[in-house]
C-alpha cells in the first residue's frame, strides 16, 4: 500500500556537473489528487530535478519511487508511457496540423481496409472530442493549431497529457501568457484533474497563484531541499524568505526620489490601429516612476509602443521638455531620449545567439563606429565591462551567449543596453515578468536608483503589489481608455481593480 496516498517519491536526489553540484540530496513527495507547488529562485535546481524525474538526466545518487515501485526512466518517452507528462512554459505544438493530430501524434488510431492499415480519422475525431469535452474545452478537433489562442494551445497540451492516462502532470509557469479569465479556466481544469486523482506538480513564481491553487509547497534553494509545507499556513513573505534564505523586511526599495518638473506630456493620444486606445492624456515628471495598471487587453502595451514609434498614432500630441515632437520610429524615439524595454524579453528583447557584450552595445553602435566605419573595440569593451560591474550582471564572461543567462541577468543586460543610449525617459513593459524573487529586488533597486538620478520611468505591470510598491503615481487603463490616476501612497489593490474594470 502506498503510504499517505503518495504517488511519487524522489529521495535524496543528487546531480553533479563539472565544477557544480546542481542537486544535493533533494526530496520531493507528491500525493495523488493534489497540486504540489515546486518553488525556488532561478538556479535553485527545479528544472534539473524535473529532468532527473523524466530521465533526461541520470541522477548521481538517490531514488525515484512511482506508485510504490522504484523506477529509473531512460528518457522522456519512457516517463510519458509510465504516466508522467510535462507541459513546458514554451509551448511547441505542430501549428499546421489539426488539434486531433497534435493530441495523437505518433500514435494515430489505425483501421484495416482491404488488409491495409490506414489512419482511422473518425475514431481520432471522436476520441479527441470526448477528451476535450471532459476538460470542458469547446474546440473542434479539426481546427488547425495555428488558429488557437495561447490558452487553447495549453489546453491542447493538457488534453495530450490526459490522453496518455497521466498520473502526474508537471506544469512549468503555466499562466505566464494567460489573461485572468484564461487563468480561471485553467484552474477549473486543474480542479477537475485533481478530482480524477491526477497529481499536479506546479512550478511558478506567482505567489498569489500558489497560495490559491496549491495544496502543498516544496521550496528549493541552491540545489538543496529546504522543506515542504501545507499551502494553507503559508504567506507570501514566508515563501520568499524560505526561497532567498533571509527574513524579508522589505519587498521594495524605499522611495527616495523627488519628482521634478514635467518632462513628457501626452495629449489626447488615439491609436491609428482600429482606435485600440483613444483620447489618452497624462504627464510624466523628471525622476518620477509612473506605473500603468490594467487588465490584459487594456491596451497598455499598444499605448507605450505608440509613444516609442512602433505603432502609428491617428490623433494627439507628445511633448518632450515643452516642445512638441513627432515620433515616427524607434530611431526618432532614441533621438528624443526615450527607451523601451519590451514585454517579451526572449522574443523582442534579447538577441539570444549574440554575446552579453554585443547585446549590451547593440542599441548604440553609432557611438562605437569610427570614421572608417569600424567598431572601436576598446571603447565598446570599456562600456561593456562598466555595465556588467555597475548592474552586477552575473555572467561567466562578456563573451557568453546571452541565452545562457538567467532571466534576471538577461533583463539587466537590456537595462544596460538602453542606459548606454543616455535616455531621459525609460518605458518598461512588465520588467520583472518571469524573474525570480531575489532578482526582482535587484531590478527594483535599479529602477529606484535610476529615478533618484533623475531618469523618468513609465512602468507597466500586471502585479498590483509591484505597482503600489514602486510607483509615485499609478495610471490605470480599461478597454483602451484612461480610467483613473492614483497617487502611489494612497493606492490599494481594491481601488486599482475598481478603475481597471470601470468600462467593462
UniProtKB/Swiss-Prot annotation:
GO terms for molecular function: ATP binding; ATP hydrolysis activity. Pfam families: ABC_tran. Its main location: membrane. InterPro entries: AAA+_ATPase, ABC_carbohydrate_import_ATPase, ABC_transporter-like_ATP-bd, ABC_transporter-like_CS, P-loop_NTPase. It is found in: Cell membrane. Part of the ABC transporter complex MglABC involved in galactose/methyl galactoside import. Responsible for energy coupling to the transport system. This is Galactose/methyl galactoside import ATP-binding protein MglA. It comes from Clostridium tetani (strain Massachusetts / E88). The lineage of its organism: Bacteria, Bacillati, Bacillota, Clostridia, Eubacteriales.
